[in-house]
Amino acid sequence: MLHDRTFSALSGLSAVQTANVTYTPDTAPGSLIANISVSPAKPYYIQWGIDNTNTAGDLGVETYVTYQDKNIFKGSEIWRIRLGGAYEMVRGAIEKGFDTKNFFEFSVNTSLAFPRVLSPIFNDSYAAKKGKTVFSTGFVWQNRPEFKKRYLTFDWKYMWATRRNRFSHTLDLYNITYTIVPWILPDFQTKYLDVETNALLKQNYTNQFITRTSYTFSYSSASVTASSLMKVKKNAKSSSNFSFMIDISGTLPYTLAHIFDYKQNADKHYEIFGVPFSQYARFDIDYSRTFRLGIHQSLAFHAGAGIASPFLNSDQIPYERRYFAGGPNSVRGWSTRELGPGRYVRKGSADFFNQTGDVKLLAQAELRFHTEGIFEYAIFVDAGNVWTIQEYENQPDGKIVLDELAKDLAASVGAGVRLDLSFILVRLDVGMKGYDPSTREWNITSPQFKRDVTLHFAIGYPF
């Protein structure tokens, strides 16, 4: 155990390229002398890249440059800075009345990571010395034909592991996201944002101030250390994983606003820098279990649930913190954000803002077939949906009703092929709608390929 701890601690330092621990007999009976040797890693890292983009058929190009110092303070601290830029030509922008067809985005992100927990409370514990503290901040400048946005972010995070890495902890001590929308095309505002049924869409194009604190705990039955990693991969047996996350937003700003008697706007909400801050609570829980049925087969199960609720200074959850269903890791008979909430009927091909919810339920089962080569195969069944906790005008039939819960659960079946390249697993899944809660019909009895079949390309297992 001490050998694994030493090897893992040294290998986890960014300034160390390789580490080796050997033993020689000591003069004292029953004792050994540990000889530790390390080789330093290259301290600097520079990467430049350029790539093409395709967003809903709009072609563009993006480029970035990243610089990283792996030992900036001579104690394996990592400083990283990334500069990025993107251009995209929006099809039909001029015909739609936009002044330009160009989309520009510039970004700068920087982070500083320390190989220990910087806290006076836990600083002397083994977990703290093996943990990590990360400070990061970023800015995004975005101009589109229909609007302009600016994002400013800051994050202060602790990460550590215990029980031979079986238990992992992440404390996001304070995360701030400040979003400004300085300009919106009047025609875009009138046609889309001012429509009463587009309340969620409008929320995404308003100034926002989100502060949050979260804690995530995860458990893995496999003890993964540097010396046992390959053994775990090659001789994988039945395993289980469990995690939960608690996310609280807006508590500190609301406390300060209440103490210092900040002024409220017309909606009775406190503001910071003239922007109402979000306030909500969110809880997620997730469990998965894999059973080895033999050398070439395994059966995997997954269940997940989540609930989020606004309170005090907010009436709705911010869009980026809401739940969605469908996609390569969800109910695979639907594409991402095409399912729910509840019995909600999709309006058009771009209704993803309204297809989100405050409650999520998901259950999945997958029978996997492993071969001697690099290919794997699977058949699967998924069930789940998202709901709102209250009836919103723009999301009719989206509210969760316990008596109707079973009828609101969507179901899909499918099959997939996976390419296991050891360092990465490439997955191609084909899902088919089995039961659609929006129509209350079993599509599986008379499937239509275009309507009911969805193709998913992803990296890694779905769970």
Identify the meaning behind each predicted range:
Residues 1, 45, 94, 99-304:
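Transmembrane beta-strand segments of outer-membrane beta-barrel domains in Gram-negative
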Residues 1-54, 281, 306:
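Periplasmic polypeptide-binding modules associated with outer-membrane biogenesis and secretion
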Residues 14, 27-29, 56-60, 74, ...:
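Transmembrane beta-barrel outer-membrane domains
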Residues 32, 298-380, 388-390:
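Extracytoplasmic gating/loop element in the C-terminal half of outer-membrane beta-barrel translocons
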Residues 40-42, 71-73, 116-118, 160-162, ...:
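Outer-membrane beta-barrel strand-turn architecture
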Residues 91-95, 149, 166-168, 254-260, ...:
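Outer-membrane beta-barrel and related beta-rich outer-membrane complex signature
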